[in-house]
């Protein structure tokens, strides 16, 4: 049943997606980079300010970079943030004393920039925003005030503005005490703002009951505003993505997400798949279908399903919503520019002039084309929906990355010793973050093994990836491959495992012990070095791909530098050569397969588009290698 649902959803999605060469996300991103070339700055008389709107857009741009490996998206993110962040990490136009939780959102982009570039200014700027949360005024319960000028008020919007950044910072830098606080923000918001009859949440809650918009008994605003609900849903999913799975409040957040999704599903417009601005009053005079909220609901639900936080039965809600967005809101003008119409520019509570939260107030706000919040939400939704057709390729399969034979450790900027070099969560040059995204785009779970491989440890792995086994230069106390380790891996391969060996050249890895393993499959890495590259003379690392290569069927050229030669004997065979130098080798053993090459060549530096010329198709090759490896996984029962 689940399989048939998935197939029908994918078929429907493929009908909806435009036949144009560029996907909707790419066309919308082109509009973004045309309208806002270096920030949300279009009028010289009104210089751009540090604002959450930009963070919404840049999260969408970030997702496109992850999916395409095209450096123009990363460069755009960096250019936008550099417009505000100086070399010392100060943020232009930002005032911590405002205690405006909206201002925290862009911290997520700062964390990405620091993780990728290691430039300290981004860490310093992100830490300024983290420090704001340390002293942010709170309700008596402990919830963050939305702004200093809105005392004792929690708005649904604020959960998206603050909590995903708070979670990412805490996860990255080991602030374990923060997770209970983060969970409580959602728990308190739901307890205070959720309508028990409909499951919907009111836009705002005033603990003091002093605001004119607040019900004197409950403190709640009068209406269910769609975008406020949508911000809240996006926040739940983005927080869960980085929230410790074993934390005592993880289940609490998941249950809140389920209640949220149930409520949203019930008020989806059955005709268009979209959602109205005042979400529960579709027939009210002047009410309209709204683009930003619809995009956010689609993104939140689709992402929650992809990450396993919601069952697949919710996916048709996202699919129907996305089809409606493409039909009702996305348009191309005479110049060929893609635009998003139908986003309400703003809706709030209180302030000056005073916003009373009435239905008439919500209907009075302007609905505009290419509003940053709507465009950013659409980009994020499109990133989720455009990956959907490939997610079923290897659903339920797992790739296990070795962190035992390659167990390098390094102190991070806080002085904490952490695993580094070819790790799933590393975004700097030497990490495998983008490669991990490639595998996950096909439904493969990415996990790590930090102990010796045993029958039990390997039992749930379909693919086992060992990269750049340590020598003493890498690790003073390396875990060398032992005969017992080699035997365990050999037996696992024979039973149907897919082993991937990405080695290195002389001086950069252990050869003596690692070959104990490789030799068992007829593959021997020689302690030498070829494909030398001097500076940016990339030609030295060029490897031409002949037509019809079984692993890389559509690439013409890849880049591998400083690799060792490989000697083969039965059962191993070459899959790719450069002259007489073996580049790719494979071996079949029992039900299993081994793939080997003498370079960790798919680390971020050579797939993220920022360094090597585009003629070297390493990012595309990562996708084709992943698909080839998935095909080698035996079908159960055969």
Residue map of PLM features:
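Bacterial Sec-dependent N-terminal signal peptides
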Residues: 1-22
């Amino acid at each position: 049943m689940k399989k048939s649902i998935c197939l029908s959803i994918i078929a429907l999605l493929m009908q909806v997606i435009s036949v144009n060469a560029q996907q909707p996300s790419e066309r919308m991103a082109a509009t973004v980079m045309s309208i806002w070339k270096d920030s949300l700055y279009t009028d010289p008389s009104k210089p751009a300010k540090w604002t959450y709107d930009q963070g919404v857009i840049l999260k969408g741009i970030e997702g496109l970079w992850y999916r395409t490996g095209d450096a123009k998206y990363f460069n755009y993110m960096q250019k936008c943030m550099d417009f505000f962040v100086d070399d010392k990490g100060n943020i232009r136009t930002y005032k911590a004393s405002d205690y405006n939780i909206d201002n925290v959102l862009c911290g997520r982009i700062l964390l990405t920039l620091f993780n990728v570039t290691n430039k300290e200014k981004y860490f310093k700027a992100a830490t300024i925003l983290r420090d704001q949360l340390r002293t942010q005024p709170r309700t008596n319960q402990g919830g963050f005030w939305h702004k200093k000028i809105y005392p004792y008020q929690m708005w649904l919007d604020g959960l998206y503005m603050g909590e995903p950044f708070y979670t990412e910072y805490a996860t990255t830098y080991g602030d374990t005490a923060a997770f209970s606080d983060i969970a409580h923000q959602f728990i308190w918001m739901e307890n205070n703002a959720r309508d028990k009859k409909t499951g919907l949440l009111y836009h705002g809650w005033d603990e003091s009951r002093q605001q004119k918009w607040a019900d004197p008994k409950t403190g709640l605003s009068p209406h269910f505003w769609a975008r406020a609900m949508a911000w809240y849903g996006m926040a739940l999913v983005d927080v869960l993505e980085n929230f410790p799975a074993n934390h005592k409040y993880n289940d609490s957040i998941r249950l809140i997400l389920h209640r949220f999704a149930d409520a949203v599903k019930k008020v989806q417009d059955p005709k268009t798949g979209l959602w109205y601005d005042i979400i529960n009053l579709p027939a009210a005079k002047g009410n309209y279908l709204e683009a930003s909220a619809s995009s956010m609901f689609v993104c939140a639900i689709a992402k929650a399903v992809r990450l396993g936080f919601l069952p697949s039965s919710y996916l048709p809600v996202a699919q129907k919503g996305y089809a409606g967005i493409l039909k009702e809101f996305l348009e191309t003008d005479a110049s060929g520019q893609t635009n998003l119409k139908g986003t309400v520019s703003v809706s709030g509570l209180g302030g000056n002039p005073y916003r009373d939260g009435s239905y008439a107030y919500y209907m009075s706000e302007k609905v505009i084309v290419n509003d940053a919040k709507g465009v950013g939400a659409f980009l994020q939704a499109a990133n989720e929906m455009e990956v959907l057709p490939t997610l079923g390729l290897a659903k339920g399969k797992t790739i296990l990355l070795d962190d035992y034979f390659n167990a390098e450790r390094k102190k991070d900027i806080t002085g904490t010793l952490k695993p580094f070099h070819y790790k799933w969560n590393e975004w700097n040059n030497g990490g495998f973050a983008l490669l991990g995204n490639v595998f996950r785009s096909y439904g493969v779970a990415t996990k790590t093994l930090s102990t010796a491989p045993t029958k039990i440890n390997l039992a749930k792995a379909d693919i086992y990836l060992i990269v750049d086994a340590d020598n003493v230069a890498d690790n003073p106390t390396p875990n060398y491959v032992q005969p017992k380790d080699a035997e365990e891996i050999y037996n696992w391969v024979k039973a149907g495992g897919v082993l991937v060996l990405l080695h290195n050249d002389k001086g950069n890895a252990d050869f003596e012990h690692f070959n104990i393993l490789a030799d068992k499959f007829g593959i021997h890495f020689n302690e030498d070095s070829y494909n030398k590259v001097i500076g940016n003379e990339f030609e030295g690392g060029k490897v031409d791909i002949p037509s019809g290569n079984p692993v890389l069927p559509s690439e013409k050229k890849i880049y591998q530098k400083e690799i060792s030669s490989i000697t083969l004997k039965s059962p191993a065979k070459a899959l790719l050569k450069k002259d007489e130098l073996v580049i790719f080798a494979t071996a079949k053993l029992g039900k299993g397969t081994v793939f080997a090459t003498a370079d960790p060549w798919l680390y971020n530096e050579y797939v993220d588009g920022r360094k090597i010329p585009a003629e070297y198709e390493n990012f595309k090759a990562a996708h084709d290698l992943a698909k080839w490896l998935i095909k080698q996984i035996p079908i159960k029962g055969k």
